[in-house]
Amino acid sequence: MSKANLTHHFLIAAPELSDPRFEQALIYICRHDKHGALGLMINRPLEQSRVGKLLEDLDIEVTDAQVMEDLALEGGPMYPEVGFVLHTGQPEWASSFAISENVCITTSQDILKRIAAGQGVGHYQLCLGHASWGKKQLDQELANGDWLVCPADLNLLFDTPFEERWQIAADKIGVNFDYLSSDIGHA
C-alpha cells in the first residue's frame, strides 16, 4: 500500500489496465488523502465539444475567438455533466482550490465568464466529469500495477499535444511500454 500523497502527480495507465474507460489514460491527481482520490483525465479531447459552444450553451457570451476553438476534455466517467476548470494561477474564484503552488481547480461559473472574455486565466483546460477512487482503492490499483506514477509538470499538463501526453509521461519516468512486463513481481 502506498503512503505517498499523489496530489499534483500524473497516473499513467498501464497497457494491461482492463478498464477500457482508462485505456492509455493520463490522469492528473487533484486530491489524494485518507478518504480517497480525485483526478482528471488530461489526454482525451472531446472532438464534438468546443469550449466556446459549451459556454454559449450556458448563456455565457464568448468574445475570445480562441475559446471557440479550444476543445473540452473528458475528465473521467464520474459526473460527465459537471465541468471542472483546471488552470494556472491562484484560487481566486468562487469555488476554487489550489492543487499546487500554481495549479488550481475551479467549478464555479465566474471563471467561465472570464475565460469567455479571454481575461484573467493563463493556461486552462475544461474537463467534463472526473475520475475518483474510494478509501485505499487507488493504493490497491497501484499495487496491482494498473497505474504508473509521474510527477506533474505544467508543460505536460497544459502545452503538450493531447495525443502525445500518455507516452511523454511514460518517457519522463524512463518507461518503454514495449518492454514493460505485465507479470508483476516476477523476473
Curated annotation (Swiss-Prot):
Lineage, uppermost ranks = Bacteria, Pseudomonadati, Pseudomonadota, Gammaproteobacteria, Moraxellales
The record's NCBIfam families line, in alphabetical order, gives: PRK00228.1-1 (NF001266)
Protein's UniProt name: UPF0301 protein Psyc_0057
**Gene Ontology cellular component?**
cytosol
Organism, as annotated:
Psychrobacter arcticus (strain DSM 17307 / VKM B-2377 / 273-4)
Q: Which PANTHER family match?
A: UNCHARACTERIZED PROTEIN YQGE (PTHR30327), UPF0301 PROTEIN YQGE (PTHR30327:SF1)
Q: Which family does it belong to?
A: Belongs to the UPF0301 (AlgH) family.
